[in-house]
Regions:
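Conserved nucleotide-sensing/catalytic segment adjacent to the nucleotide-binding pocket
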Residues: 148-199
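Residue-level preference for the first positions of well-ordered beta-strands
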Residues: 104-108, 134-135, 168
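A short hydrophobic beta-strand->loop->alpha-helix junction that borders the nucleotide-binding pocket
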Residues: 137-147
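Conserved RecA-like P-loop NTPase ATPase core
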Residues: 1, 69, 121, 139, ...
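Walker A/P-loop nucleotide-binding motif
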Residues: 99-121
């Protein structure tokens, strides 16, 4: 590589995707590879933020960690299983289904309104972002609204695909009982397309 970090002539500088480039196994090659990985994630995150304006971890959740969640739930033993599941997902990248004993790469917390599901999930997405992964935190109503608003300007498919391909997504208030009105076929289709793709 002559200390360029590349094997061959294809480089991201020249507009080739990282998949097309061959990075050298030497120390320089690994530094160059890590640089382009960080740059790729930063671009993906910036694109996500353009497509879903305001979609990020809300300020009042940003300081939540596993330790702070455990401390908040110290007198609520019924939350232990959910917190343990989030910790397992952070630690090993999957959760063992307690019923089927199969491993799942996704994590869903269900329960009544105001029980702390969102706060409990926060450390998972924070950890992923800190590890250099792209992420999307968005309420389902805002997500569906963003897709539907894309019908007017032709960005609905681009937005849906971005949400499908982001490294980590936190959909808040999925199945919100307090929402007025029945679920429309369009809303169901949008949510199905996202969940089915990621499943």
């Amino acid at each position: 590589c002559a200390d360029t970090g590349y094997q061959g002539w294809k480089t991201p500088h020249a507009g080739y995707s990282m998949e097309e480039c061959i990075f050298c196994e030497c120390a320089t090659g690994q530094r160059v590879l890590e640089y382009w990985k960080r740059k790729s994630v930063a671009k993906k995150q910036a694109d996500m933020e353009k497509l879903f304006v305001g979609a990020c971890i809300p300020a009042h959740f940003r300081s939540f960690t596993l330790d702070s969640i455990r401390q908040r739930a110290i007198n609520e033993p019924d939350k232990k299983a959910a917190i343990d599941a989030v910790e397992q997902w952070i630690t090993v990248g999957y959760v063992e289904d307690p019923v089927t004993k199969r491993y799942k790469s996704g994590l869903v917390l269900a329960g009544d309104y105001g029980r702390g599901k969102t706060g409990t999930m926060t450390p998972a997405i924070r950890h992923s972002l800190e590890q250099g992964k792209s992420g999307l935190w968005i309420e389902v109503t805002d997500f569906v609204g963003a897709i539907q608003s894309g019908y007017r300007d032709g960005t609905s498919l681009e937005r849906l695909e971005a949400a499908q391909k982001v490294d980590v997504i936190l959909l808040d208030d999925l199945g919100d009982k307090s929402r007025d009105g029945a679920e429309t076929d369009d809303r169901r289709r949008i949510i199905y397309q996202l969940v089915n793709y990621r499943h």
